[in-house]
Amino acid sequence: MELNRMIDHTILKPEATEAAVQKIIDEAKEYNFFSVCINPCWVAFASEQLADTDVAVCTVIGFPLGANTPEVKAYEAADAIKNGANEVDMVINIGALKSQQYDYVRQDIQGVVDAAKGKALVKVIIETALLTDEEKVKACELAKEAGADFVKTSTGFSTGGAKVADIRLMRETVGPDMGVKASGGVHNAEEALAMIEAGATRIGASTGVAIVSGATGEGY
């Protein structure tokens, strides 16, 4: 297993400067991470530099609250892909899920899936820290029904990040063929490997260098 190729090297802080984003890009190239995960305004900047590498460009949609309209999320995804994104991590409408508006949630995801079809992978952030286990299961089922490629635990901006028990539950729900991304709170190789053992196929972290070099990092 190549741990570096399971990492989305992440910088999503609102105050991230060009220099900070550049550092993430440079580290991703040096360590051959799977992707950089950056805010949409940096997609073209990253895409130009990573075009001739194995590092993908991942961005976020409806982030971090998930409360945009479906139309805006679909447009945001299309715009990001036009700018060079290979993967889009969208946030579900958490309030709609909790209101049991399941058709709305499914259609919200479907709009992004349709915008990305044939062009980019779609990961669905369900924000596990805000959900009951039953809601986590339902969110994963809706993401799978809508044709998403991955389910993802967290934005890193809520009350908690990835937990091994949540990864296990998500993997059990979506089955063996869909991706599961653990994001938020993974700081070292031991934590990353625990997530992978539980069923994660991707790790989202700002601490990618620490994870692959055996250190413990601070951050998302």
From Swiss-Prot:
Domain of life: Bacteria
Pathway(s): Carbohydrate degradation; 2-deoxy-D-ribose 1-phosphate degradation; D-glyceraldehyde 3-phosphate and acetaldehyde from 2-deoxy-alpha-D-ribose 1-phosphate: step 2/2
Keywords: Cytoplasm, Lyase, Schiff base
Gene3D superfamilies named among the record's database cross-references: Aldolase class I (3.20.20.70)
GO molecular function (one): deoxyribose-phosphate aldolase activity
EC number(s) per entry: 4.1.2.4
Catalytic activity: 2-deoxy-D-ribose 5-phosphate = D-glyceraldehyde 3-phosphate + acetaldehyde
UniProt GO cellular component terms: cytoplasm
Any one GO BP annotation for this protein: 2-deoxyribose 1-phosphate catabolic process
Enzyme kind, highest EC tier: lyase
Record keyword GTP-binding present: no
Compartment list: Cytoplasm
Pfam family, one: DeoC
SUPFAM superfamilies: Aldolase
Keyword Cytoplasm applies: yes
Active site per UniProt: D89, K152, K181
Record-linked HAMAP family: DeoC_type1
Family: Belongs to the DeoC/FbaB aldolase family. DeoC type 1 subfamily.
Functional summary from the UniProt entry: Catalyzes a reversible aldol reaction between acetaldehyde and D-glyceraldehyde 3-phosphate to generate 2-deoxy-D-ribose 5-phosphate.
The protein's name in its UniProt record: Deoxyribose-phosphate aldolase
Species of provenance: Enterococcus faecalis (strain ATCC 700802 / V583)
